[in-house]
Swiss-Prot record:
Record's catalysed reaction(s): K(+)(out) + Na(+)(in) + ATP + H2O = K(+)(in) + Na(+)(out) + ADP + phosphate + H(+)
UniProt-annotated stretches for the region Disordered: 1-31, 212-231
Protein localization: Membrane; Cell membrane
Compositional bias of kind Polar residues: 212-227
Family: Belongs to the cation transport ATPase (P-type) (TC 3.A.3) family. Type IIC subfamily.
The protein's name in its UniProt record: Sodium/potassium-transporting ATPase subunit alpha-2
EC number: 7.2.2.13
Superkingdom classification of source: Eukaryota
Residue positions, PTM Phosphothreonine: 570
Topological domain ranges for the Extracellular compartment: 107-129, 307-318, 790-799, 864-915, 968-982
Active site: 374 (4-aspartylphosphate intermediate)
Length: 1020
């Protein structure tokens, strides 16, 4: 909103030209909103204003006229952003992403059951059960995800202010309190310190009125408001107050010139809610994964469909096989696993003060490669603090730490006594009542930020300011105004022969002009050229640190001329304001938060670029950027190089400067190519004096570079950028409702350092999801191969559908989820951000490891157990080939085994179901080893250790569940699972050990020969 966003700029969105009229219309509106505010009410004289809005500037509107306008324009409120209806959100959870795969599986199962029912008198119910279970899984998981997100949005709703705002209007000459929603254009409104401005106002009269525009323009200093037209730009002029900003002090009257969505604030909110938001990285990953799995499933299904036709099966049977293979490829439990893993991480992050609004944002933060951070309140403490003083011709450092543990200075000098007295007396800030037990730095004050900083500084170093003011009562005052740039007050002295002292503070150069002497070590000496140079050097040094500098002076008024009780006249000045005595300078800054420099350092080592985007002054922005390490030591901007070499800036090659400070007014005239060049060529960037539209353009610029962008902000002005970013991060304490609504994540403690924790959690969950998926997919092979051999070799079915479900939704679930708790293998904050093009959640190497290597060993273990049991019962492997048709024939009750014994149909089926149970138990045994090897992707399990208690519980839980399913009475009827001999459990042990040894050797080669053939082929 501030200083012009590039008018020639058109957002990336506009490339989709063919989207029909509606889309074009919307894009046109968004482009309009990206431009600056156009209004001319600030240029009108009061008479013209009254005529334009048909209002009496002293009595206000009539009640009838106000009613008519309200009926015409509607209430003075922002249209809430279009929210997604709850049923749509629920359907997204039910039919989005991974769920589609399971729904297709369920439909195919019902189709297969239908075909069988048409063909046979007594069809097997397996497919029916499977279809029902698949549908149930999707519905339960969908409800769970929906509940999680609904819970987060409930927390969001609680942020909304429950109190209806009131406004003081004057109608028909009467003052009345009404609901702010009933304010109309043309209303005469009065605001005072502490009020929220109810609409956009044109000021017609004011008394010392200051407003806090920080949520709109990012300027942390309160801005003076008066009836004069001072600037062409409506956002800069003094005679306009904006809707939803706060009046800090003083009073003002104004005419309402815009309400609701037509206000400047309303425009920003509309801009934010109209932006298109892209897919999250994890959603893209899951889409890619579904394509891979579907590809594998369809390839296998079609291959065996063709093969079974060649082998002479009827086409109906072949279709049943096709469906069976596709369904067997669907990892039923994975959807639930991913959801639970993300939820667990979201809960962990909430404990560390990051509230994640939607689960997918958890991982987005981990892939972030650029953070565009606001300055005020995120990188800094959001409280002005006295940083330095200059008196007795030297600079003293004050304590700016959050817990007052920093530097101290010598307070014995009589000059400091005088300086502290002026700072305490020439000061209108006061502590709010009832805070005696709170430490001074944490107390709330009434008054502007700079005065509050002085008040706290003096209270900390000299004791009670209230007592000081009681001893020196104020008898006259000229408040600060923009023309003379000083504040002056006169106090009676109780502790001195002089009856009055005049104290003054203001812009240092203005104060110095009024002085003829200077106080050094308590003595007044003439203000000569040498002292003026010393002042100039100190002023430049403190200003160069990005600090706000104030000058202080005093004059002891002679008692003869000004006796006690003298009437001072502040309009027709009857006292001197020249030839004063200069005492010193004090400078203030909003200091960096303690944890930020460390957090910025961590981002740098994690390969994340931190860009500062602020509405503040370039010098201040650069000073804070250097203070927190966004511009690191030794890195120079073009201006720094020019100053060092003593040459004009135009002669410096911009590529030599690693750091860069861009002014909003320069950004306004840049083409998108020039912006891209800055973002590409400089590693450390600060944007100062930017408007909200420019913030949005910077985010879009970073995204054009292929970066995954996180944006932090607290003001309403940040909401378009928050919405556009891959992940928007709002501030929980200082943030406005609009910014929280637009963000994906909320920092409950407003601390930049919490973002770094979030990045770490996000990277960890991506690694752990990989492990979880690798673990889950591996058991697909021992589940599919029995079915394939059943088709090709015509053997009795080694593993039934129901037992597959017991693995996917029973024994595998807890172990897969337990991998979410696995600690990081190495320092994940020391590596570069993930490249979303190359580093996928599931890649071909993961599939080849899970399916082609570990899965195959598992299948061997299962078949070994299967053949052992059938051989013990008399069916040697050679007898089993081609036996399937007789085996499954209900009428054959005299089937001979290898030793000539005859078996009835029922007896055969009991042996077959016992094989199913044993195959299932074997998969559980080999999955033990799979779980342990999935703990790490590169390290040895012995380096990682078994510290993950949930994982140990998972191992015990899957074993206990398998034993329960095998030995519990009644399982033979319910799930057709039969008790096993103890020895049968041990058949798969050698295979389990083989998996463990095979993988440990592979990881050893990975560590010995990084980048070698083994890594290229098997490191996922």
């Amino acid at each position: 909103m501030g200083r012009g966003a590039g008018r020639e700029y058109s957002p990336a969105a506009t490339t989709a030209e063919n989207g029909g009229g509606k889309k074009k219309q919307k894009e046109k509106e968004l482009d309009e909103l990206k431009k600056e505010v156009a209004m001319d009410d600030h240029k009108l004289s009061l008479d013209e204003l009254g005529r334009k809005y048909q209002v009496d500037l002293s009595k206000g509107l009539t009640n009838q006229r106000a009613q008519d306008i309200l009926a015409r324009d509607g209430p003075n409120a922002l249209t809430p952003p279009p929210t997604t209806p709850e049923w749509v959100k629920f359907c997204r959870q039910l039919f989005g992403g991974f769920s589609i795969l399971l729904w297709i599986g369920a439909l195919l199962c019902f189709l297969a059951y239908g075909i069988l029912a048409a063909m046979e008198d007594e069809p097997s119910n397996d497919n029916l059960y499977l279809g029902i279970v698949l549908a149930a899984v999707v519905i339960v998981t969908g409800c769970f995800s929906y509940y999680q997100e609904a819970k987060s949005s409930k927390i969001m709703d609680s942020f909304k202010n429950m109190v209806p705002q009131q406004a003081l209007v004057i109608r028909e000459g009467e003052k009345m309190q009404i609901n702010a929603e009933e304010v109309v254009v043309g209303d005469l409104v009065e605001v005072k310190g502490g009020d929220r401005v109810p609409a956009d106002l044109r000021i017609i009269s004011s008394h010392g009125c200051k407003v806090d525009n920080s949520s709109l323009t990012g300027e942390s200093e309160p801005q003076t408001r008066s009836p004069e037209f001072t600037h062409e730009n409506p956002l800069e002029t003094r005679n306009i107050c904006f809707f939803s900003t706060n009046c800090v002090e003083g009073t003002a009257r104004g005419i309402v010139i815009a309400t609701g969505d037509r206000t400047v604030m309303g425009r920003i909110a509309t801009l934010a809610s109209g932006l298109e938001v892209g897919q999250t990285p994890i959603a893209m990953e899951i889409e890619h994964f579904i394509q891979l799995i579907t590809g594998v499933a369809v390839f296998l299904g079609v291959s065996f469909f063709v093969l079974s036709l060649i082998l002479g099966y009827s086409w109906l049977e072949a279709v049943i096989f096709l469906i069976g293979i596709i369904v067997a490829n669907v990892p039923e439990g994975l959807l639930a696993t991913v959801t639970v893993c993300l939820t667990l991480t979201a809960k962990r992050m909430a404990r560390k003060n990051c509230l994640v609004k939607n689960l997918e944002a958890v991982e987005t933060l981990g892939s972030t490669s650029t953070i565009c951070s606001d300055k005020t309140g995120t990188l800094t403490q959001n409280r002005m603090t006295v940083a330095h003083m200059w008196f007795d011709n030297q600079i003293h450092e004050a304590d700016t730490t959050e817990d007052q543990s920093g530097a101290t200075f010598d307070k014995r000098s009589p000059t400091w006594t005088a300086l502290s007295r002026i700072a305490g007396l020439c000061n209108r800030a006061v502590f709010k009542a009832g805070q005696e037990n709170i430490s001074v730095s944490k107390r709330d004050t009434a008054g502007d930020a700079s005065e509050s900083a002085l008040l706290k500084c003096i209270e900390l170093s000299c004791g009670s300011v209230r007592k000081m003011r009681d001893r020196n009562p104020k008898v006259a005052e000229i408040p600060f105004n923009s023309t003379n740039k000083y504040q002056l007050s006169i106090h009676e002295r109780e502790d001195s022969p002089q009856s009055h002292v005049l104290v003054m503070k203001g812009a240092p150069e203005r104060i110095l002009d009024r002085c003829s002497t200077i106080l050094v070590q308590g003595k007044e000496i003439p203000l000569d050229k040498e002292m003026q140079d010393a002042f100039q050097n100190a002023y430049m040094e403190l200003g160069g640190l990005g600090e706000r500098v104030l000058g202080f002076c005093q004059l002891n008024l002679p008692s003869g001329k000004f006796p006690r009780g003298f009437k001072f006249d502040t309009d027709e000045l009857n006292f001197p304001t020249e030839k004063l005595c200069f005492v010193g300078l004090m400078s203030m800054i909003d200091p960096p938060r303690a944890a930020v420099p460390d957090a910025v350092g961590k981002c740098r080592s994690a390969g994340i670029k931190v860009i500062m985007v602020t509405g503040d002054h370039p010098i201040t922005a650069k000073a804070i950027a250097k203070g927190v390490g966004i511009i690191s030591e030794g890195n120079e901007t073009v201006e720094d190089i020019a100053a060092r070499l003593n040459i004009p800036v135009s002669q410096v090659n911009p590529r030599e400067a690693k750091a860069c400070v861009v002014h909003g007014s320069d950004l306004k005239d840049m083409t998108s190519e020039q912006l891209d060049e800055i973002l590409r060529d400089h590693t450390e960037i600060v944007f100062a004096r930017t408007s909200p539209q420019q913030k949005l353009i910077i985010v879009e610029g970073c995204q054009r570079q292929g970066a995954i962008v996180a944006v932090t902000g607290d003001g309403v002005n940040d909401s378009p950028a928050l919405k556009k970013a891959d992940i928007g991060i709002a501030m929980g304490i200082s943030g406005s409702d609009v910014s929280k609504q637009a963000a994906d994540m909320i920092l409950l403690d407003d601390n930049f350092a919490s973002i770094v924790t979030g990045v770490e959690e996000g990277r960890l969950i991506f690694d752990n999801l990989k492990k979880s998926i690798a673990y889950t997919l591996t058991s697909n092979i021992p589940e599919i191969t029995p079915f394939l051999l059943f088709i090709i070799a015509n053997i009795p079915l080694p593993l039934g559908t129901v037992t597959i479900l017991c693995i996917d939704l029973g024994t595998d679930m807890v172990p897969a989820i337990s991998l979410a708790y696995e600690a990081a293998e190495s320092d994940i904050m020391k590596r570069q951000p993930r490249n979303s093009q190359t580093d996928k959640l599931v890649n071909e190497r993961l599939i080849s490891m899970a399916y082609g290597q570990i899965g195959m060993i598992q299948a061997l273990g299962g078949f070994f157990t299967y053949f052992v049991i059938l051989a013990e019962n008399g069916f040697l492997p050679s007898r089993l080939l081609g036996i399937r048709l007789d085996w499954d024939d209900r009428t054959t009750n005299d089937l001979e085994d290898s030793y000539g014994q005859e078996w009835t149909y029922e007896q055969r089926k009991v042996v077959e179901f016992t094989c199913h149970t044993a195959f299932f138990a074997s998969i559980v045994v080999v999955q033990w080893a799979d779980l342990i090897i999935c703990k790490t992707r590169r390290n040895s399990v012995f380096q990682q250790g078994m510290k993950n208690k949930i994982l140990i519980f998972g191992l015990l839980e899957e074993t206990a569940l398998a034993a329960f399913l095998s030995y519990c009475p009644g399982m033979g009827v319910a799930l057709r699972m039969y008790p096993l001999k103890v020895t049968w459990w041990f058949c798969a042990f050698p295979y389990s050990l083989l998996i463990f040894i095979y993988d440990e050797v592979r990881k050893l080669i990975l560590r010995r020969y990084p980048g070698g053939w083994v890594e290229k082929e098997t490191y996922y």
